[in-house]
């Protein structure tokens, strides 16, 4: 599905662009019957828009060897979400297992990515999810992801689109099913309070030990968290009902100690399935291993194109391309550039994700003939104004 450049000699911008094109261009895009274009032409526009963090319209406007933005979007509107998601996840898995040792167990984190959205739905109301106010809106397109942290960088394992009219647990199940197919053992599953859900907890603990941050909601949970001392206990979700779920609850007390201008006591609760041999504070320390997700989002934003289209599948495709580019960078950084040394490879600081994106941008702008001049007006400053200006 892709060929890693030769590790001898040098890795060039041309090499990076070629492998990015090799990875992204085959993504399934039905296209327009009778068109002289092929899917690769359209995906090059998307790649350039992503590494430039700009729109498809602006990308097409500024280059001579790309189709117009209307044609590009007409093609992208033919995307099939399920087929696109399936192939993209195969690629994410291929990248991940290029750099992850299958014989080493891993800590896997799952999370929702909310992409803020202004406007109405495209075809169905279920396309849009609700979120806390952000960027002047409370609606978003939502994606569920799973990742592991390797060499201090998050590697995306799986991603799926989340609809408002489906149970979020169904989306989580799709991601967990993909994670379960990886050849490495899973030591621990970590998730924030958005995954505090009976079905999610039941499914996750079947796969591995599970730690989920608990929201401070409900009188019984608030009573459990009303303490000044860390402790382990048992909690019954949906107590005395057919859906009742018992799980170990870790209640950890810590102190702000002036962090971010705050002080005093803070009490947090965690679902602690499979880690009851740990203290509540140790469970909290396990949960903090998911902190690498902020790095992932920061990198994704460096390669996420902009679009005003309401089509959720096109917006999802742009997010998938960003995730694939991020994983590809991790592969090239480790497999081609990092120098072997005792205890692991020496990861190069100079080959950053920004550099990776800059190289692709440079090569594609040359290939697609980025415009570097504009016709002058032939008039200049009127004589009367030139005289007044001295």
Positions of PLM-derived features:
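Membrane-interface transmembrane-helix boundary segments in multi-pass integral membrane proteins
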Residues: 311-322
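Domain-level cores of phosphate- or acyl-group-handling catalytic modules
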Residues: 165-223
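An anionic, glycine-rich sequence signature occurring as long contiguous blocks
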Residues: 206-300, 304
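Electropositive, glycine- and tryptophan-enriched low-complexity nucleic-acid-binding patches
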Residues: 128-184, 268
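Active-site-proximal, Lys/Arg-enriched surface segment
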Residues: 73-149
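Short, conserved catalytic/metal-binding motifs centered on acidic residues
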Residues: 45, 59-60, 68, 72, ...
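Short, positively charged, Gly/Tyr-enriched micro-motifs
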Residues: 22-90, 103, 150-153, 187, ...
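A short, flexible helix-boundary coil/loop motif
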Residues: 1-37, 52, 65, 224, ...
